[in-house]
Amino acid sequence: GIKVNIDKKGTILPNNVEAAFDFVNGDIYLKKKPSVINMHHEGFHAEQWLDIGKEQYMNLSRLEREEYVFEQVMKNKHLFDKASIDHSIEYIERLRLKYK
């Protein structure tokens, strides 16, 4: 399973990061009040990690992992506000330019 850790003291995650998925250990880290989109984003990483296994997940490129998350966000966009969707689109487009 996936362990969810709350960064209560703000000592685990950098200030500009609300949530993160540790794919080596299979842990999600959340700040005290993460946005809905960030919770789901990391949850989608965890979902893929569980589906294909740690080893296969670690062999994926960052872009491949983020493309999966983006696809899941778009399938579930009714859960998110417009600003969150727009940010997700901008984020994946930046990564596509950087990694393709």
Where are these regions (language model features)?
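Catalytic toxin/effector domains delivered as secreted proteins or via bacterial secretion systems
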Residues: 1-100
